[in-house]
């Protein structure tokens, strides 16, 4: 079904069965599969390929040569109808690739809202990405990676399968991430190592000074006290009742499956 207000260039191909919402713009030489749903106000500039099953929300802008919803690069994939779901108001720049999920996981790749994916960024199968994140040029997420809200992943960075990146993290360019990065942490390198709290980012996002100080205390307890991980968690737990931000930090540590960067 194509809404009457949608604008589709004569050279674009939209397969029968695709659902195209109000005020959608599909530019020259785009291809939209039959199992695709595109929400109101989204724009495909030109030469964009969208395969399905894929659902794209409202007011996204997808630039030329992006490949959205293609089958994954997992050798176990056998043609199953797995999904990609994208939220609202994302900017997806040139040559970005986003793949559908696998049945070995939950069968779905999820991208939240208000994210920026710069040129050549890659989102592999079964990734889960929050809201208001930035992925710089050539940032690469392997399969099953989870990224929290308002994280920044620097250019040319690569994140190993199953790693988790916490809320408000900032990864420097060229980082190789093979373990989980706790919330609020700045990290960089090969292999990626922590070097402090994303203080400036937290200030910009409205965190109070006392909250930031509490987060810094938790960081120092974890990384600079010389305590074991279990002992550090016990110390950090003492501030979780007063500071929900510290509680989030501790919960991340407790849930980590791959271990945290050190």
Curated annotation (Swiss-Prot):
One of its GO terms (biological process) is lipid A biosynthetic process. Keywords: Acyltransferase, Cytoplasm, Lipid A biosynthesis, Lipid biosynthesis, Lipid metabolism, Repeat, Transferase. It is an enzyme of class 2 (transferase). One of its GO terms (molecular function) is acyl-[acyl-carrier-protein]-UDP-N-acetylglucosamine O-acyltransferase activity. It comes from the Bacteria. Its main location: cytoplasm. It holds the Pfam family Hexapep. It is found in: Cytoplasm. It catalyses: a (3R)-hydroxyacyl-[ACP] + UDP-N-acetyl-alpha-D-glucosamine = a UDP-3-O-[(3R)-3-hydroxyacyl]-N-acetyl-alpha-D-glucosamine + holo-[ACP]. One of its GO terms (cellular component) is membrane. Involved in the biosynthesis of lipid A, a phosphorylated glycolipid that anchors the lipopolysaccharide to the outer membrane of the cell. Homotrimer. Belongs to the transferase hexapeptide repeat family. LpxA subfamily. This is Acyl-[acyl-carrier-protein]--UDP-N-acetylglucosamine O-acyltransferase. It comes from Vibrio vulnificus (strain YJ016). The gene is lpxA.
């Amino acid at each position: 079904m194509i809404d009457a207000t949608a604008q589709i260039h004569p050279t674009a191909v939209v397969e029968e069965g695709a659902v195209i919402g109000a005020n959608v713009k599909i530019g020259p030489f785009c291809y939209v599969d039959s199992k695709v749903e595109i929400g109101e106000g989204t724009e495909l500039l030109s030469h964009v390929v969208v395969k399905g099953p894929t659902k794209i929300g409202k007011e996204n802008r997808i630039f030329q040569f992006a490949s959205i919803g293609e089958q994954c690069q997992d050798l176990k994939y056998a043609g199953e109808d797995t999904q990609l779901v994208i939220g609202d108001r994302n900017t997806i720049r040139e040559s970005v690739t986003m793949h559908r999920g696998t049945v070995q996981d939950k069968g779905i790749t999820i991208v939240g809202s208000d994210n920026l994916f710069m040129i050549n960024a890659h989102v592999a199968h079964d990734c889960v990405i929050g809201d208001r994140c930035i992925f710089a040029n050539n940032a690469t997420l392997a399969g099953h990676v989870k990224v929290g809200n308002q994280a920044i992943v620097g250019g040319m960075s690569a994140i190993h399968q199953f790693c988790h990146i916490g809320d408000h993290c900032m990864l420097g360019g060229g980082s190789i991430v093979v373990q989980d990065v706790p919330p609020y942490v700045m990290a960089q390198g090969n292999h990626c190592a922590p070097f402090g709290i994303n203080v400036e980012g937290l200030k910009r996002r409205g965190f109070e000074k006392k909250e930031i100080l509490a987060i810094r205390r938790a960081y120092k307890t974890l990384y600079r006290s010389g305590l074991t991980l279990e002992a550090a968690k016990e110390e950090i737990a003492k501030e979780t009742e007063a500071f929900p931000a510290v509680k989030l930090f501790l919960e991340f540590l407790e849930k980590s499956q791959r271990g945290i960067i050190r």
